[in-house]
Amino acid sequence: GIPNEFPEKVMKQAQRVPDHVLDADRDGRLDLRHLQTVTIDGEDAKDLDDAISLTKEGDIYHLGVHIADVSNYVQYNSALDREALKRGTSVYLADRVVPMLPERLSNGICSLNQGEDRLALSCLMDINEKGKVVSHQIAETVINVNERMCYTDVKNILEDTDEEAKKRYEALIPMFFMMKELSGILRNSRHHRGSIDFDFPESKIILNAAGKAIDVKPYEANVATKIIEDFMLMANETVAQEYCTEEIPFVYRTHDNPDPEKVESLLTLLHNQGVKIQKAKEEITPKEIQQIIESIEGLPNEAMISRLVLRSMKQAKYTTECSGHFGLAAKYYCHFTSPIRRYPDLQIHRIIKDNLRGRLMREGRTEHYAEILDEVARQSSVCERRADEAERESDKLKKAEYMSYHLGEEFEGIISGVTGWGLYVELPNTVEDLVHVNTL
C-alpha cells in the first residue's frame, strides 16, 4: 500500500530544517534575485518546484528554468531521504495528496514561494529562433519569485479575455507573450522531429467541502500549461544531454521503441479501419506514429484508435542507461524539474551538485553513484506504477460516486473500445465504463 503517515523520526528531522534561507547557504551561489521570475501552476498547488525567467537579446532567448534545491535540505541517507526513496513520488488522489516529503518542506522552504529568497538549481539556456539550445549553464543559485501565477490568469492574459488580470500583472505581460512565442518554437521543433502528442482529456473531479464528487469534467491543456510543459521538457533534455555526453553515472527517463509484434497487429487493425500507414523500415519511428495520430484527427473512431496506438507502446521508466525517449523522439531525457515530488529528480540534483563542486572525481563519488543508481531507478519506476494505479483507482471511485447521483438518466457517449464481453463507452465528461454484452 501507499504510506500515509510519516514516521516520527522523519517529522523530527523536518522540524529541524530552517524555514528561511540562511546567509551561509547563499555563499558561492549565483545570485539571480534581480531576474523577473514567475511560477505558473494550478490554483490549488502548494508545492511549487519550478520557476521561469525569460529575456531576449537579438535573436537569442535567455530561458531560465529554476528548480527548488531540495537536496540542500534532504541529505543522502538521512531519515527524510530514506522515507522519500521508499515513497518514490507524491501521489495525487482525487481528494488528497500523499506527499513524498513532509509538508513543512514541500510547501515551505522547498517551495518557490512568491517574494521569498529560495535556493535553486537553475538550467540557464540560450535558445535561437529555430528552438536549438546554442549554449547552457547549470548553476546553484538564489532566486526570488516576483509573482505566483496560475494557469488560468496567464491563459486569459494571452487570449485577452480578462481586463482585471491584465491590469494586475501589467509589468509581466511582455514576458508572457515572449513565453508563448518561444513555447511555439520549441513545440514546432519537437513536432518536426516526430514527438508524439496523445491528446487524451484528463479528468478534473470537483469535490464539495465534504469530499463528495459534485462534478466531473475534462481537464483541458491550454496555452499556459503548454508553455510550462515545453520549458520543462527543454530543461530535462538539456540536462540529460550534458550528463550522457560526459558519461557521468545518472538516472534517465527512457521510453523504449514499441514491441514489433504489437506494432504489426496495430497496423493490421488500422488497415481494417481504413487507416493506411507504411513504415519505411523494420522498426516503426515516432514520426510514423505521429502521422497515424494526425491522420485520424476528427474521425468518429479517433478515441478508439488513439487508445489502440497507446496500448502498443511501452511504458516509460527510469534507467541508468541513456537509451532515448521514443514518445518524445528525444535522444536524451531525464526528470530534473520536480524534486519535491519525484525521487529521481532529487537524486540527479545531488549528482549535478557534486559535479558542479568538482567532487565527482574526488572522494569516490562516481563509484558511489555507480553502485546505488540502478536500485534508485528500479525503486522509482515501481513507485511510479504504484502511484499511477492508486490515482486511477481513486479517480474511478470518485467518478462512480458522481455517476451514482445520476442513476436512470440517459447519456450520450462514444464507443472507446470493444471486447468479447461488451463495449466501453466514454462520456464527454471523461467517465468511461463497460456496457456488458448481457445488457445489450
Language-model features: where?
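Electropositive polyanion-binding surfaces
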Residues: I2-L440
